[in-house]
Amino acid sequence: MRLSLLILALCCSLAANAGKTSGTYHVPEVGKSPDPEMTVLSVEDRDGYECRYVEFTVEGKRRSRERVRAYLLIPDQASETVKCPAVLMLHDHGARFDIGKEKLVRPLAAVLPHGSDDHIARSSRQWVDKNFDGVWLADSMARQGYVVLAADALYWGERSNPEAQRWSELNYADKEDFSEASDRTLDVRARKDTIKALKTRVYEGQRKVYDDLFARDVIWAEKMLRDDIASVGLLKSLPYVDTENIGAFGFSMGAHRCWMLAAFCDDVKCGVALSWMTTLDREAEMSASDYSMAVMPMREQMDFGDIGMFLAPKPMLFLNGETDHLFPKEKVEVAFEKLHDHYSENPGQLKTLFFDGGHHCGKQVQASIADYLDENLKGPKYTNPVINADYSDPDICRVGDDYYMTSSSFNHFPGLQILRSTDLVNWELIGAALTDYPGPDWDDSLPWDVLSPGLEPDEPEAPGAHEWRTVPQHGCGVWAPAIRYHDGEFYIYCGDPDRGVFMVKTKDPAGKWDDPVWLVKAKGYIDPCPLWDSQGRAWLTHGCAGSRAGVKSVLFIAPMSEDGTRLLDRSRIIYDGHRTQPTIEGTKFYEYEGRYYIFSPAGGVSTGWQTVLRSDNPYGPYDEKVVMAQNGSPVNGPHQGGWIETASGEFWFMHFQDKDAYGRVVHLQPMKWNDGWPVIGEDEDGDGVGTPVTRYRMPDLPFTGVKRPADSDEFEKPSLGLQWQWAAVPSPYWSHADASKGCLRLYSVQQSDDWKNLWDSPNLLMQKFPEDRFTVTTRISFTPNPQLKQKSEACGLVVMGESYATLRLEDSPEGIRLKMVECIDADNGSPERVVFSRAVGSEPLPVPASNVYMSTTVPPVAPLPYVETTVYFRAQVKDVPREGNVPASVCTFSYSFDGNTWHKVISDGQEYEFKVRPGRWIGAKVGLYCNRYHSKNDSGWMESDWFRISY
């Protein structure tokens, strides 16, 4: 018996590498492919890519040349300057021969005899419905930015024979569809007899193909391998393909082809093999349909898992269903173990995974395939949200290689926190633009716009500077900013729904910002955005708050001075969205390729979508289009944000998702332009409305390390970390960051006479929830003022929202007590409820040495000693599933007296669990406070040595 050239090479290679179980092996040569000489036969434009029906050359009988037809899918962005990664997609066997490439690609109707009603089109649809959850995987990959090639293997599709095609058509037509089969004169019995006879001839035909090839020193598997290598050669010849990043994917028989191709073709960078890996003894039990995959002489030398000696160290992913009846798990596990043996020196390059399901490529498996190919052909991926914390209404600008973001801060200060990134995924806090919040001078000549009936200029109905320092203005203040870089300076424009529109600017976003400049006094103006257009004009768009203005769902524009400090005319309505875009708001104003665009969310914060308005004139009229919606994804909303263009010409959109107790977390979406409209996210169905991505390739930007907004604080600096915010404009009397001691001291702040609960405390020092699950631990030392006759000082750790829970230390006539307190519906003035209480000991502080200088000429008064109580506090937050896509959040508390032994807070015989709620337009926060409730000209204090967050 003569061996094929491939098997001879394999055997020689095995002999040369005898005894080796891992490392680098000689890969046998399989010959050079002919010039592909591609011809384009037909073209169809599809959403985001082009489908070409092509013909190219492979090696035929006796070294002759054979022309093979294929589908070539090309993303719209592909060009000689923007080269895209490529994937060769290899179809399965399936005992279905009438289609091959059409098992992966939606057929091009123009080349089918009967168009979209053709038998091939129906067969293709039937196959993807059965095996791919209705998805043409090649088309999906093209929409994700891959050049994709899919060709027929020998004996499939356009390379099959009439008997095989007819048998496939009859065999896969069910009783209802039988009338659609090519021979409609057959009744059911005749159909069965015909199928049986055809089946025999089809299998005889497969054996004949194998024998004919073997007689020429070629086995069928080698023929397919050579054809697949020729397909790779075609991809390499295309000027818009990134030839360093070509991968392969195959399902079932296609997986066999994939790992053979990856082993013997250096031009394939990585491979994904789905549902074809087993042991020889299992393969021997399978049917005669395996002629196309049989490598008979090799069985005396190696098992299938030994292909790993030729694959390693090439990146490979092997997947198999837990309940795959063709490839039972116990056999596949043996093969996977052998593969891993050969990858022992490069273990990270091989992944073997089992998934729930059988011999099937469902959508979850498809996502794993795309993730793996992206990781190896496009680079690493990011996961949304990129900032899993409450940065509401984010906006972004680029300056050089850096990206800057700010967001709403409402009543929390320092406000307008500034974040910076170099890759749009890893962000760090660098500063804040608002440290104080003076309002506009209501008596000056600043223009007054009245939207609310009955509102007079001398009665602004807005909290003044005093109220902003003494009472938390929950949900008021700093709404939906826009950040821009213009003429060498950073500008932030922001709307206060009760006072008007203001602007702050700086040349250094990490440094000090100028005091606010108020452009207009108004009741209800929100969400402003400036634009300096290409004609040298400046504009300001904004929305309005129905709660203040008495109307919503309308957008405005006003001309602005070139320096951005004042409006040149009153605002006018340019768009009314009541009928089609209700609750439209959050304007972001841009000029792009000669047109004006307003990006605005509509439909509500947690339930809406992204709308874009387009016009040739700033004043309109504006066309409208929904460009991103939830579309069944886990990202509800998706809400307000801004888009950015990178230096390399990529477009990205940052927006928030309302996650209830966790606040409004930040997502990064890919964006592209199609026919003058942006498409945000991934548009799988081609309707122009994108779906938010949860995982996607990293932007084409330099990676400078993993970064995230700060959270833990050791209090070793003379100022608070940038993550901290107060519930109101802070007083310098509230705290002292003592770097010499490495601690933060909070003084007990006198609360107002009408104080009801912590919702009324302006001196809460808090930060955002940093993740869905995290643990906060802090060491608190409490020193109440012994001079206070009414013992009422308290300090503690709080998880704060419209309801809150706090573990705290309280001074009382009986001494210091540790209490667990909750307040449900604190925003409605509800009283606190104690759920746990116990006494704790105190240590007297030494008498200060300075006492020796006190006068003794008057009757001496012995000073009351200060005492200190130290307790470790801990809060553990976790997400819990509930109906819908946004999890609920719960928190438990514990305490320790030595930092080692921890005691859970117990209430009613079980561990206390608090159901976390968001605040007013914000997520829940966690932090510290120190209060007193009776007047005195001095205070006690608490000290925190550190505040540590772990995930």
Where are each of the predicted segments found?
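Short beta-strand element of the alpha/beta-hydrolase
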Residues: A70, V82-G94
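N-terminal cap/lid segment of alpha/beta-hydrolase-fold proteins
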Residues: S33-V82
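C-terminal catalytic histidine-bearing segment of alpha/beta-hydrolase fold enzymes
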Residues: E337, Y343-G379
